[in-house]
Amino acid sequence: MVESLGISVFRIRLMSFVLAALLAGLSGWLYAHMSRYVSPAPFDLRMGIQYLFMAILGGSGHILGAVVGAALLTLLQNGLQDLLPHFAENGQQLEVIVFAIIYVLALQFARGGVMPFVLRYLPKPVRQAPAAAEPLPRRSMPQAGMPLLTVQDLLKRFGGLEAVSRVGFEVKAGEIVGLIGPNGAGKSTVFNLITGALKSDQGTIVFRGQDITRAGQRRIAKAGIARTFQHVKLRPSMTLIDNVLLGTYVRTRSGFLASALRLDRAEEARARAEALAQIKRVGLGEQAFDQAGNLPLGRQRILEVARALAADPALIILDEPAAGLSRPEKLGLADLLRGLRKEGVTVLLVEHDVEFVMGLVDRIVVMDFGSKLVEGLPAAVRADPRVQEAYLGSVV
């Protein structure tokens, strides 16, 4: 998912590994100076597992988790070493058994560690809305009516199955275009091909005059295409504002070192203000500091739209955005998309609610069995016998 936001997973993993290695090396240097003797014993597999369990026990998702876990495990270990010899001569062997039981219980009933339990009884921090800040840079929008996205002869095979068979269509700037069809027609596969999540076997995809057929997800995101997903992809333990903040990544410039040294506070304030503005824009402003996992599925989809808008895209691709929404929420989503069209943002969406699509889009592309069946205005598509047969079946 993060690749579609313009984030390099490889680079983040590499920097995390280098930082962890740096801290480990520094720890070893301090250990050698403290002990004045270096032995491999404290670094064997058993101790490695114990260090890992310290983080798990405290809570790896919290900054203080490792410290709390180390303190608890050390206290527990010292207590068992004093207590177990009173019950058996082989106290050290019993210690291993007791720790094994604790490991299993912790992984079964407290996967988030003890920190979530501790935080329940501590005063919750006061969440304040970000102060007004200078807006993040905006991208230039293409002139309305100009070709924005051109898909030509797109082909994708999975083994012997042609999921997408020579599909082609064009999306012009300032349009709302619907891509509809029965289940399994290949709509989401087309979206994945356009956004770089899948590579096509044949055909071309041109966006704003640039060939992006073989481009990766990061390059496509930076070019100005943002998307939502058929199956919601959020960080449920993070707040709404932090989830949407991920969408602003392609509009920020601070690097890893500047972030680590907290030299990017001004840019972060601008990004947080942008994230809050997008959350309010989609009608979730009152829940900005709630955890995303606490939202109903329909509102999680709306939150994905806010995250996509935070990237300031020229083209936003929505995969079933109205699924799980109530009728008033669907009407609100339709108004939001019409507002985006007025602002110059182009929308391409897949949706199974045909009535929702018919009342919203400018043009419709219908797919069936991986091929484009028909393309045209909503009224003409609705009346087309081929579309009716694809949805309802033929009369024998």
Language-model features, listed with the residues they occupy:
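Catalytic Walker B motif of ABC-type/P-loop ATPase nucleotide-binding domains
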Residues: 316-320
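Helix-to-loop junction immediately C-terminal to a conserved catalytic motif
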Residues: 195
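The feature captures the beta-strand-to-loop junction immediately N-terminal to the Walker
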Residues: 177-182
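Conserved ABC nucleotide-binding domain
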Residues: 213-214, 278-297
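Conserved ABC transporter NBD signature motif
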Residues: 203-210, 222-223
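Transmembrane alpha-helical segments in multi-pass inner-membrane proteins
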Residues: 13-104
